[in-house]
Amino acid sequence: MRNVLNHQMSNDKWRIVYTKQGLKDKNHAYKAGFKDKIISLLSVLRKDPFTEYPPYEKLIGALTGAYSRRINQQHRLVYVVHLQEKIVKIISMWEHYS
């Protein structure tokens, strides 16, 4: 996968990778005070990206195949799940489906 940064913990079932935009958004969101919420969401995704809590939304349109979870009222963590590779690719986490 090009333009992707990896992050994995030893006992996690799923590997988290970031697009360039996803990593840029992560840094921006951390600086804006959402670090704890994002760490919590990433922990859920590492264990099972289809866990029903916190709730996720299956996206349509230009983002068909992607999912989102709420960071707060304005911002969403948007990701794609690659089942065979057990990878969760973070697309964005700033704004509402940017």
What name fits each language-model region?
Residues 63:
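Active-site rim helix/loop that mediates acceptor-substrate recognition in acyltransferases
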Residues 47-49:
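Blade/loop signatures of beta-propeller domains
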Residues 1-27, 32-39, 53, 60, ...:
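Enriched for short, Lys/Arg-rich terminal
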